[in-house]
């Protein structure tokens, strides 16, 4: 995972001080890209322990089209709690945009179903895109999408994915984002009969919060360990049929967890 550590180092070396919505303050760079060959291991950060259950449950929650934290809570995941209202609602966030994008005529578009079918039928299409950034809905969202658009690419029987992330909390959020979209790429590849290619992660504003600088330095003092493997239940052929029982990470070696506050 040297790609991730290189981003931490770049922010330390080149970052500029900026104010932000949360009032915490950040050190930020603009424009960065990381590339991971998914055939060489599952890209879980190893220089601190990640709670993989939260990552995987959240992705399944997105794919359900859900925007209420109730299902997350039922599955012992609390990463969205700070943004939910008293009823657990978050507004039209990722799940709504992915599975039920509202059209002006009152109809909706299931972007995930659509892109999977396009991969199967038109793998060379340059329109294999899913967007969570819906300007008409931004003000109704508890938190506008940070990872806001992704595109699939098929070549030589392999499926690759590129994510554009407008805003990236590099210490807390980015390790989750890498693993989430790597998992999604594996899942979509399996249900479309493809092997995995690359995950490309492209950033707009990539930042470390001012109260994460010491934690980032600690992480950089640790040597990365070999990447684990991802194993999916090969019997699952429907993207929406995956459950936590179908997802397994093997040989995840990692350093100890590093605690850090969430900027809300």
Curated annotation (Swiss-Prot):
The active site is at 146 (nucleophile). (6R)-5,10-methylene-5,6,7,8-tetrahydrofolate binds at residues 51, 169, 263. The lineage of its organism: Bacteria, Pseudomonadati, Pseudomonadota, Alphaproteobacteria, Rhodospirillales. GO terms for biological process: dTMP biosynthetic process; dTTP biosynthetic process; methylation. Its main location: cytoplasm. It is found in: Cytoplasm. It comes from Paramagnetospirillum magneticum (strain ATCC 700264 / AMB-1) (Magnetospirillum magneticum). This is Thymidylate synthase. One of its GO terms (molecular function) is thymidylate synthase activity. It catalyses: dUMP + (6R)-5,10-methylene-5,6,7,8-tetrahydrofolate = 7,8-dihydrofolate + dTMP. The keyword Transferase applies. One of its GO terms (cellular component) is cytosol. The keyword 4Fe-4S does not apply. InterPro entries: Thymidate_synth/dCMP_Mease, Thymidate_synth/dCMP_Mease_dom, Thymidate_synth/dCMP_Mease_sf, Thymidylate_synthase, Thymidylate_synthase_AS. Its EC number is 2.1.1.45. Keywords: Cytoplasm, Methyltransferase, Nucleotide biosynthesis, Transferase. HAMAP family: Thymidy_synth_bact. DUMP binds at residues 21, 126-127, 166-169, 177, 207-209. Catalyzes the reductive methylation of 2'-deoxyuridine-5'-monophosphate (dUMP) to 2'-deoxythymidine-5'-monophosphate (dTMP) while utilizing 5,10-methylenetetrahydrofolate (mTHF) as the methyl donor and reductant in the reaction, yielding dihydrofolate (DHF) as a by-product. This enzymatic reaction provides an intracellular de novo source of dTMP, an essential precursor for DNA biosynthesis. Homodimer. It comes from the Bacteria. Pathway: Pyrimidine metabolism; dTTP biosynthesis. SUPFAM superfamilies: Thymidylate synthase/dCMP hydroxymethylase. Belongs to the thymidylate synthase family. Bacterial-type ThyA subfamily. The gene is thyA. It is an enzyme of class 2 (transferase).
